[in-house]
Each structure stands twice: as C-alpha cells, then as structure tokens.
C-alpha cells in the first residue's frame, strides 16, 4: 500500500479547508467524503466575521453563494427579549451550499476528492484507513476531520468528562421578515435554539439540549420547549416541524491535548465549542487551514507540536463559551444574563469577541485579512 502525501478524512469545512491549503502548497492531498453529493448537517448555519474572512482566504465568497447578512443578535428567554449589535457583520448559509462550495474549491485547486466513500476504521500507527469495502489507503499524514462523528481507532477520549454530552436537532421553518438581518437565540431549560434565515429564504432552526431531556422523544421535548419559549413557538406557528435531523453525543468544551505522530485532529475532532458562541465553522476552517500550513512547512513530524498549540489557543474562548452555556442552562442564570445585557449591551459584543478561536486577537481578523491563522 503506497501512501499518499496527505490523507484527509471528512469532507466538511475543516477537511475541505485543509485540502485547499495543501493543494495550494503543492501537496498531493486526498479528501475523503462519506457523502456522495449535497447534504444537510445539523450544525453550522451561522458564519461569523472570522468564518467569512477565512472563506475569502480560501477563495469562497459566501455572499455570492446567497448567504443572508446578519448584523444583530436577538436573545430571548421566556417573554423577555434583548437585541444587540454584533461586533462585525455575519451571515447565514446552509451547510448544503457551504460544503459543496468548499469541496468544489478543493477540487479546483488540485486536491483529489473521493465522494461517497465511507471510512470504517483507522490505524494511527500506519496512518492508514479502511473503507467499508475493505480497501485500505495510507497517508504520510492523516488529517482527522470527521466532525462530531467518531472513527474507530481514532475516537476521541471522552471517558473523563463529568457532564453527559448534549444532543443537537435541526429543522427548517418558513422564513419571516422579522428574521431579516438577525440571528435569534432562544434560551430554555438546559438548552437553547438558534434561528436564522438561509440562502433560499427559509429559516434554519438548530437546537442544543441536554441529552436527558430527550428521554421522552423529540415530540415530547418540543412540546416542553414550546411551552418554555413562547416566542419560539410563535415562530413555529405552534406546530412541530415534520422532520428533524439529529445528532447525539456532542461534547461541548472538549479539547484534545495530544495526538499521535502524523495525525492532525481538526475541527470538532480537535476542539468543540458551545454552538451558542457561533464560532464552530470558523474553528473548523481555521484549524484546517492552520494544520495544513504547518504540515506543508514541517511535515508529519509537526503534528504533535501543532496540536498542543491549538489546544492552548482554544482554551480561553472555549472556556468562556462553556461558562455562558452553563450559566444560561438554569432560570437564575438566564434571568441574570438578560438583565446584564439590557443594562450593558456592550457586554454581548465583548462576549462574542472573546469566544473567537480563529481570530488572532479576539475579532482582529476582518474583511481585508489574507493570511490563515496560525496555532500560536
């Protein structure tokens, strides 16, 4: 089995960003995507300013793809509502459109893209993978970009976590004019829901909730949430969506501290930020770009150094996001948060800046930025 120089498992934003940067650097990159074509994903409809800048660096114009501009956050808890300006312009775009654009860009700059191929296991010692048909492929370096899904042989070590992972749900709602230019965040007991317009005018609804709240099933959970969040119920016209996409076992706050030689863990395989921070796509893009640049300059031997640096870099933003998530999980914390933001709305913008991992200094990257973020 002759290894390829760089093997990327996962065709989401992290994997595609790594493939683009590697191909640009003249590295023969093989990108493996388990999906045969366009598909939806539970997470990732919000593009922060740092994500938009990273996409421009990669040669992808989100607004040209139809992304809906977002300039304000509307935070809702029960009947209370606070509206805040975001520190920089953001946008809403479906993962179906975003992922296809990134994979197309990777192919255009010279990466080899294999779609519709499911990887069943990995051998970290050999930096190799095994497909579901038994075929094997090895790389000089292996970039693990499987998102929230585990890969046998390289599964994340979550055994020491004190908190059970969360669950994520996604549905599509009819759009409405009151969502123009806004992302809504509806807070409720042990969870929250984000709502924004995407490119086709529909509204993307993403929920994060403590897994134990799903014990009675999705229908029972949604009935409870609609009672707790009346304004969200109004957005849903009092009806439960006909279809939900779901993912379980989301370990918010998790970061990998070390890796095996030649293995780069990027995106959610390296660090998982609470989705209320709105930085997941930016982290995916930034980690993929940074890891690829490190490999291009230092080879497979640089993986362990890069991973340790990314772990350090993500500590504060992810820690702040976790404090916000846990604080908003209960009624006392939610009430305090709403009061603080009503009295001092500037705290919202500061929190948004402090939960950025990919921006060099909490929001420094703007539309003119042209270099991928390093891990330092």
Model-identified regions with their sequence ranges:
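Residue-level detector of alpha-helix initiation sites
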Residues: 12-13, 37-38, 282
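C-terminal helical "tail/cap" subdomain of flavin- and related membrane-associated enzymes
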Residues: 293-376
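FAD/FMN-dependent oxidoreductases across multiple families
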Residues: 213-294
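A conserved beta-strand/loop capping segment in the N-terminal third of enzymes
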Residues: 52, 56-103, 124
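Beta1/beta-strand and adjacent pyrophosphate-binding region of the FAD-binding site
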Residues: 1-14
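Glycine-rich FAD pyrophosphate-binding loop
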Residues: 9, 20-43
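Redox-cofactor binding/interface segments in oxidoreductases and associated redox assembly factors
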Residues: 9, 144-145, 265
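Predominantly flavin-linked oxidoreductase catalytic cores and closely associated redox partners
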Residues: 105-235
């Amino acid at each position: 089995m002759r290894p390829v120089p760089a093997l990327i498992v996962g065709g989401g934003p992290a994997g595609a960003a790594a493939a683009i940067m590697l191909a640009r650097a003249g590295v023969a990159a093989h990108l493996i995507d388990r999906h045969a074509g366009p598909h939806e994903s539970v997470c990732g409809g919000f593009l922060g300013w740092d994500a938009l800048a990273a996409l421009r660096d990669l040669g992808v114009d989100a607004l040209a793809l139809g992304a809906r501009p977002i300039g304000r956050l509307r935070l809702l808890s029960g009947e209370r509502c606070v509206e805040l300006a975001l520190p920089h312009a953001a946008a809403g775009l479906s993962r179906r459109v975003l992922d296809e654009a990134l994979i197309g860009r990777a192919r255009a700059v010279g990466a080899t893209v294999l779609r519709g191929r499911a990887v069943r296991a990995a051998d970290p010692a050999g930096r190799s993978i095994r497909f579901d048909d038994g075929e094997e492929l090895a790389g000089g370096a292996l970039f693990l970009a499987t998102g929230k899904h585990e890969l046998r042989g390289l599964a994340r070590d979550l055994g020491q976590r004190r908190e059970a992972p969360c669950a994520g749900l996604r549905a599509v709602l009819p759009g409405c004019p009151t969502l123009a230019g806004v992302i809504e965040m509806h807070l409720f007991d042990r969870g929250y829901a984000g709502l924004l317009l995407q490119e086709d005018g529909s509204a993307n609804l993403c929920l994060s909730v403590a897994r134990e709240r799903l014990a009675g099933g999705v229908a029972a959970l949604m009935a409870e949430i609609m009672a707790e969040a009346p304004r969200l119920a109004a957005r849903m016209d009092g009806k439960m969506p006909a279809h939900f996409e779901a993912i379980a076992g989301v370990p918010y706050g998790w970061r990998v501290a070390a890796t095996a030689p030649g293995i780069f863990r990027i995106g959610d395989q390296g660090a998982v930020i609470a989705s209320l921070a709105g930085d997941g796509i930016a982290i995916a893009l930034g980690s993929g770009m940074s890891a690829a640049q490190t490999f291009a300059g230092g080879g497979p031997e640089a993986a362990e150094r890069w991973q340790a640096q990314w772990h350090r870099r993500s500590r504060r933003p992810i820690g702040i996001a976790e404090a916000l998530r846990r604080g908003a999980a209960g009624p006392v914390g939610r009430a305090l948060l709403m009061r603080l933001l009503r009295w001092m709305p500037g705290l919202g913008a500061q929190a948004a800046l402090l939960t950025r991992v990919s921006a060099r200094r909490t929001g420094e990257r703007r539309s003119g930025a042209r270099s991928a973020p390093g891990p330092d």
